[in-house]
């Protein structure tokens, strides 16, 4: 083994297998691109993103860790979200929750 070497299992690895997911249609109503990272609490994203916020409370993008989705000005797209796991306590981001979900 080499330090830092990854030894992945053979075949495909499904991200977030068995976790609760939801799809939401999002429109960027602003005049600047908005990028949302993989672990950002989607409910607390930039106010220029228009979507059903209450439906996204406790969810993040269902994408690989360390990646992001970019919403161009005027763009509308549907994204898949996955429920936050663990203790489901949210601090930071835009300060809209600051505690248990």
UniProtKB/Swiss-Prot annotation:
Report the superkingdom from the record: Bacteria
HAMAP family hit by this protein: Urease_beta (MF_01954)
Q: Which Pfam families match?
A: Urease_beta
* Top class in the EC scheme: hydrolase
Q: Does the keyword 4Fe-4S apply?
A: no
Per its record, the protein catalyses:
urea + 2 H2O + H(+) = hydrogencarbonate + 2 NH4(+)
Q: Name one GO molecular function term.
A: urease activity
Q: Which family does it belong to?
A: Belongs to the urease beta subunit family.
Tell where it localizes: Cytoplasm
In its UniProt record, which GO terms are filed under biological process? urea catabolic process
**UniProtKB keywords:** Cytoplasm, Hydrolase
Q: How would you summarize the oligomeric state and partners of this protein? A: Heterotrimer of UreA (gamma), UreB (beta) and UreC (alpha) subunits. Three heterotrimers associate to form the active enzyme.
The protein's name is Urease subunit beta
- The principal localisation class reads cytoplasm
| Family annotation (CDD domains) | Urease_beta
Question: Part of which pathway?
Answer: Nitrogen metabolism; urea degradation; CO(2) and NH(3) from urea (urease route): step 1/1
Instruction: Identify the EC number(s).
Output: 3.5.1.5
**GO CC terms on record?**
urease complex
Listed PANTHER family: UREASE (PTHR33569:SF1)
């Amino acid at each position: 083994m080499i330090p830092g070497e990854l030894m992945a299992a053979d075949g495909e690895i499904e991200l977030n297998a068995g976790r609760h997911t939801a799809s939401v249609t999002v429109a960027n109503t602003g005049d600047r691109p908005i990028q949302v990272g993989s672990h950002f609490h989607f409910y607390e994203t930039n106010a220029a993103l228009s979507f059903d916020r209450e439906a996204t409370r406790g969810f993040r993008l269902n994408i690989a860790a360390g990646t992001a989705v970019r919403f161009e000005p005027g763009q509308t797209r549907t994204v898949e979200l996955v429920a936050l796991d663990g203790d489901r306590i949210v601090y930071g981001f835009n300060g809209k929750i600051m505690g248990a979900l």
